[in-house]
């Protein structure tokens, strides 16, 4: 069984190998900057527990309008997603969240996790803007 220290060390090795920027938040948590195209960056935290690592990535703040349409869109996407799911906090801000066993912290799985973060945060960004911020967008044009 992998412990939190070896899981964290494996993540750090992976991040260095892939030239991803990261910082230590505390002794159990690492924040990683995932580059994107539509959404320039997504910050993801990896919090290591005794048996699992929890991933949280901020996607976008709470929608200004059409909340129900945004949340419905997120829930419909959740059915098809790998390893992560959209969630909201008490402010209505949107995150990607996931929990993985420490034994899953392999290069192949980390590649899938980072690919999922990129696809689900960056790939969905414009759709979320169009659904939840249309008035603000039109006001800027």
What role is predicted for each listed range?
Residues 129-141:
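Short, highly charged C-terminal tails/helix-capping segments
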Residues 76-81, 106-131:
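Ampiphathic alpha-helical segments that act as solvent-exposed interaction surfaces
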Residues 1-41, 87-89:
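Charge-rich, low-complexity N-terminal segments
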Residues 54-93, 97:
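Short, internal acidic amphipathic alpha-helical interface segments
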Residues 35-59:
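Long, continuous compositionally biased terminal/linker segments
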Residues 27-28, 50-51, 91-93:
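Beta-strand-connecting loop/turn residues
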Residues 3-10, 66-70, 109, 113-116, ...:
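Short amphipathic alpha-helical segments
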């Amino acid at each position: 069984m992998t412990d939190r220290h070896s899981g964290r060390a494996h993540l750090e090795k992976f991040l260095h190998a892939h030239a991803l920027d990261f910082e230590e938040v505390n002794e159990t948590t690492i924040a990683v900057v995932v580059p994107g195209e539509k959404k320039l960056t997504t910050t993801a935290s990896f919090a290591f527990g005794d048996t699992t690592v929890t991933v949280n990535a901020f996607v976008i703040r709470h929608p200004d309008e059409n909340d129900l349409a945004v949340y419905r869109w997120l829930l419909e996407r959740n059915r098809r997603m790998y390893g992560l799911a959209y969630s909201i906090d008490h402010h209505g801000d949107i995150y990607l969240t996931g929990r993985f066993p420490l034994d899953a912290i392999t290069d192949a799985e980390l590649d899938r996790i980072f690919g999922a973060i990129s696809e689900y945060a960056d790939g969905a960004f414009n759709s979320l803007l169009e659904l939840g911020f249309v008035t603000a967008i039109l006001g800027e044009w």
